[in-house]
C-alpha cells in the first residue's frame, strides 16, 4: 500500500485547522494555548480516509511567523501540499514563505485551496484565482488545481477530498529498501509504557523488536511498540506518521530533531557539501562565511556557509557551498534543507545535500566543483565511477553500490560490466570494484616498493605478504589488500606465494659459491631431521670468509620456504617438516585429540623437542591446545595443501 503525507501550508488564521477538521473530523489543535488563542502553535496530525479504504496522513502546521520553526519541523516528510489561501485576505507574507519552503524541500505535487469562499462574491473569487495563479507561476503548484471551500457551508469539502484522493493515487511511492529513518518532531513519556517519539518515517520500514539508534548521539534502543494514528501496528513504512515506543532509553536523552534510524546506518557530520540557493524574492545577500540557521528534518543548527566558487550569493542565484555546523547532524545525500538568515530571522533559501561526509574544502578548487557537479547532475555512470573513486583503495562491493543508489543489486550489474569493459573500473574480486586510476596508482607504488626490496635483498624470494599489505595498503582490510595483490598477479605483474610477493620478472641468482653453500646447508638440515640445526651451528660449518655468504644464503632459504624456523634460530628442512605434517594429518583421521606423550612417541624424540614442534603447530593455527591435549586448529587445512 502507498503511504502519503499531505502537508497544510498557509498564513495564520486562513482556516487550515478548520479545513482539516472538516475533512477528517479531527481537531489538530491539541495544546491548551492553541485552543485559547485560536491559532496553531505546534504540529497537528490527522488521518484522512478515502472511500476505497485507502488513507493519507495530514500534517497541520502553524501559520504564524513566530512558529515557522515548528512549521519546518513538520514539512520535512511531506509528499503533497495543500496551500491554503483565505478568500477574504488572499496571499499574505506567510503564504509566500510557506510556498518558498515547500519548493525548497522538493515537494512535487499538491493543490491550492481557497477557504472561506462564502465570505466573498464570485467576481472576487475569480480575481483571486488569477492572482494565485500568477503567484505560483514557476513553482511546483503551477497549473495545479485550485478549489474553493467553505467549512461553514460545506461547499467544496467533498470535491477537495476527491482531489486529494486522486493526488495520492499518483504520488511517487517511497523505497522500502533503504535503512529506516524517522526524524523526531515530538518526544514524551506515558506511564506504563515509557519513552515515545513521533515523526514521519521518510525511509525504509521499521518493525516491533527492531534494534535502533538515535542520532546524532548514537544512543542504542529497541522498538517496543508502534502506532499509526492511534492504532497498534507491527510495522511502519516510509510515508507513514508513527508513534514509536522505545525501550532502553529515557525521554531526557532525546530531543526534537534527533533521528531514529537503523543501528549503524547513519553517521553524524559537522560539515555538509550542498547546492545552495538564495530565493529570488530574498532581501539578503548570502556572503561566504555568513552564519545561517539550517533546518533539516525536525532539526535546527547554526551553520557557517562557505561558498566554494564565489564571494557572495545574490537573490535568485545558486552555487556549491560547504555548510560547517555548530553541532553534529545526521543527514543523507539528496536530503533537502532550508536556511534562514541569522538576524533578522527570515527564510532566505535552501538546497539539497550532495555529500553528507565531506572533507574540509578550500574555496575555488576546480576538482571539488567538478566532483559536486557530478553528484548533482552527472549521469548514472559518472556518479557510479565517482562513488567508487571516492572510496580509494577500499573500493566498493555490488551491495555497497546498490545501497548507495537505492537500487536492487541487479540494477548496477549491467552498468558495471560496461564500465569494466571500457577500462573505467576493475573487478578486483567477485563483486568488488576499484576505479582504474586508483589501481594504476597502487601498482606504481607496489612496483617501486618491490624494486627497492629486490635491490636490497637480492637473495630473498620476495617481500613477505604481511609486510607488503602493511606498506602498500596501510590500515586497509586484509581481504581487500589480498584482492588487489591477486589482481596484479592475474595481470602478470606479480608472483604470489602463500608467504611472499615479488615482481614477475624477478628471480634469485646465486653465485657458484653461494650455490655450493646452499646445497651444504640443505643437506645438513635434511640429515638433522626434525631436531633441526641452529643458525649459528650452520654458519660454523664454513670458514670465516664464507660466514657472511652463509648468512645471506640462509636468509634466502628461509624466504623461499626451503628451510623453516621451527623456533627462533632453529632451522628444519621443508621435506622433513612435510613428513611430520603427513603424520599429524594421518593421526587426526582416526583420533579427535593428540597428547604430548603420543606425539613424542610418534616422532621418536624427547618430550621437550616434541613440545617445541607442537608449539610451532599451535602458532600456525594448525593445532589448538585445550588443557593437556591438542585438537584441530582453524588452519589445519594448510597441511593438506
Language model region names:
Residues 1-61, 65:
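Conserved G1/Walker A P-loop phosphate-binding module
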Residues 64-65, 88-92, 107, 116-121, ...:
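Conserved nucleotide-binding/hydrolysis micro-motifs of P-loop NTPases
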Residues 11, 187, 204, 226, ...:
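Residue-level recognition of beta-strand microenvironments
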Residues 8, 120-124, 134, 249-565, ...:
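C-terminal effector modules of nucleic-acid-centric enzymes and ribosome-associated factors
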Residues 117, 123, 134-282:
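Conserved catalytic-core segments of large NTP-driven translation/proteostasis enzymes
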Residues 55, 61-66, 76-127:
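Conserved Switch II/interswitch segment of TRAFAC-class P-loop GTPases
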Residues 19-22, 94-101, 127-135, 159-167:
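Alpha-helical scaffold elements adjacent to nucleotide-binding pockets in ATP/GTP-utilizing enzyme cores
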Residues 13, 19, 38, 60, ...:
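Residue-level signature of catalytic and energy-coupling elements of molecular machines
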Amino acid at each position: 500500500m502507498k503511504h502519503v503525507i499531505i502537508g497544510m501550508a498557509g498564513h495564520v488564521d486562513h482556516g487550515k485547522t478548520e479545513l482539516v477538521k472538516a475533512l477528517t473530523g479531527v481537531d489538530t489543535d491539541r495544546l491548551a494555548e492553541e485552543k485559547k488563542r485560536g491559532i496553531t502553535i505546534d504540529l497537528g496530525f490527522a488521518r484522512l480516509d478515502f472511500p476505497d479504504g485507502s488513507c493519507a496522513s495530514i500534517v497541520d502546521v502553524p501559520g504564524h511567523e513566530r512558529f515557522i520553526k515548528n512549521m519546518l519541523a513538520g514539512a520535512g516528510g511531506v509528499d503533497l501540499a495543500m496551500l491554503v489561501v483565505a478568500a477574504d485576505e488572499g496571499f499574505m507574507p506567510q503564504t509566500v514563505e510557506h510556498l518558498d519552503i515547500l519548493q525548497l524541500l522538493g515537494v512535487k505535487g499538491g493543490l491550492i485551496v481557497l477557504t472561506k469562499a462564502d465570505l466573498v462574491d464570485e467576481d472576487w473569487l475569480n480575481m483571486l484565482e488569477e492572482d494565485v495563479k500568477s503567484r505560483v507561476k514557476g513553482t511546483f503548484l503551477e497549473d495545479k488545481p485550485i478549489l474553493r471551500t467553505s467549512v461553514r457551508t460545506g461547499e467544496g469539502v467533498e470535491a477537495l477530498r476527491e482531489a486529494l484522493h486522486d493526488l495520492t493515487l499518483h504520488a511517487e511511492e517511497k523505497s522500502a529498501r533503504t535503512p529506516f529513518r524517522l526524524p523526531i518532531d515530538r518526544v514524551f513519556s506515558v506511564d506504563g509504557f515509557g519513552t515515545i517519539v513521533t515523526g514521519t518515517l521518510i525511509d525504509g520500514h521499521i518493525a516491533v523488536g527492531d534494534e535502533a539508534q538515535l542520532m546524532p548521539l548514537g544512543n542504542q534502543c529497541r522498538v517496543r511498540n508502534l502506532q499509526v494514528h492511534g492504532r497498534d501496528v507491527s510495522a511502519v513504512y516510509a510515508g507513514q506518521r508513527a508513534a514509536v515506543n522505545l525501550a532502553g532509553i529515557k525521554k531526557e536523552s532525546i530531543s526534537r530533531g534527533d533521528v531514529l534510524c537503523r543501528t549503524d546506518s547513519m553517521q553524524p557530520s559537522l560539515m555538509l557539501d550542498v547546492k545552495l540557493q538564495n530565493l529570488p524574492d530574498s532581501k539578503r545577500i548570502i556572503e561566504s562565511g555568513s552564519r545561517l540557521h539550517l533546518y533539516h528534518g525536525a532539526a535546527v543548527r547554526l551553520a557557517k556557509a562557505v561558498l566554494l566558487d564565489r564571494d557572495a550569493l545574490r537573490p535568485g542565484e545558486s552555487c556549491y557551498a560547504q555548510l560547517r555546523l555548530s553541532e553534529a547532524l545526521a543527514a543523507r545525500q539528496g536530503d533537502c534543507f532550508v536556511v534562514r538568515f541569522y538576524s533578522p530571522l527570515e527564510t532566505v533559501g535552501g538546497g539539497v545535500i550532495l555529500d553528507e561526509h565531506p572533507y574540509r574544502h578550500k574555496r575555488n578548487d576546480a576538482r571539488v566543483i567538478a566532483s559536486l557537479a557530478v553528484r548533482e547532475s552527472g549521469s548514472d555512470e559518472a556518479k557510479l565511477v565517482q562513488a567508487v573513486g571516492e572510496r580509494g583503495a577500499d573500493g566498493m562491493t555490488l551491495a555497497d553500490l546498490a545501497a548507495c543508489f537505492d537500487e536492487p543489486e541487479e540494477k548496477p550489474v549491467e552498468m558495471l560490466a560496461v564500465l569494466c569493459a571500457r577500462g573505467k573500473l576493475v573487478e578486483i574480486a567477485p563483486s568488488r570494484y576499484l576505479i582504474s586510476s586508483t589501481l594504476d596508482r597502487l601498482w606504481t607504488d607496489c612496483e617501486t616498493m618491490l624494486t627497492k626490496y629486490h635491490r636490497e635483498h637480492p637473495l630473498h624470494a620476495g617481500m613477505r605478504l604481511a609486510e607488503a599489505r602493511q606498506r602498500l595498503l596501510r590500515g586497509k582490510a586484509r581481504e581487500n589488500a589480498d584482492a588487489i595483490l591477486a589482481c596484479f598477479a592475474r595481470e602478470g605483474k606479480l608472483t604470489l606465494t602463500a608467504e611472499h610477493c615479488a615482481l614477475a620478472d624477478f628471480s634469485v641468482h646465486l653465485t657458484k659459491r653461494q650455490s655450493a653453500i646452499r646445497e651444504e646447508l640443505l643437506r645438513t638440515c635434511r640429515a638433522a631431521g626434525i631436531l633441526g640445526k641452529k643458525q649459528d651451528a650452520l654458519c660454523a660449518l664454513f670458514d670465516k670468509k664464507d660466514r657472511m655468504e652463509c648468512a645471506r644464503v640462509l636468509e634466502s632459504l628461509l624466504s623461499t620456504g626451503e628451510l623453516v624456523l621451527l623456533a627462533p634460530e632453529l632451522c628444519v628442512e621443508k621435506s622433513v617438516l612435510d613428513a611430520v605434517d603427513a603424520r599429524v594429518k594421518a593421526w587426526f583421521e582416526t583420533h579427535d585429540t593428540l597428547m604430548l606423550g603420543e606425539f613424542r612417541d610418534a616422532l621418536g624424540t624427547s618430550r621437550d623437542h616434541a613440545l617445541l614442534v607442537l608449539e610451532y603447530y599451535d602458532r600456525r593455527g594448525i593445532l589448538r591446545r585445550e588443557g593437556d591435549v591438542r585438537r584441530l586448529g582453524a588452519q589445519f587445512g594448510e597441511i593438506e595443501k
